[in-house]
Amino acid sequence: GEFTRLMMEETGATGPWAGFNVMLAANMLREAAAMTTQISGEIIPSDKPGTLAMAIRQPAGVCLGIAPWNAPVILGTRALAMPLACGNTVVLKASEMCPGTHRLIGQVLVEIGRAS
């Protein structure tokens, strides 16, 4: 597809290697999506009688992802997948050597309503 073609053009990767990277990136996204059902808080026994302590998991806020040029699809996706799944905002610093690949990742996120 388009990710494979762009990775081949921008990095000089072979078709099979680029396709493998796209497959790995898709698997990372599936794994991150599955993790969203497992993010929860905990109730912890307290030293004080009659009370409970709670640990609440919440987003960290704004995260920075730095995506290098050598494997832009998989490394760009890795920088985004888990932070987004945990409810964070992510700013991706894309490599100037492969802007098309990282731009396409952003376009896909906009299309599915996960970025603006």
Provide a role label for each language-model segment.
Residues 41-116:
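Rossmann-like NAD(P) dinucleotide-binding subdomain of oxidoreductase/dehydrogenase enzymes
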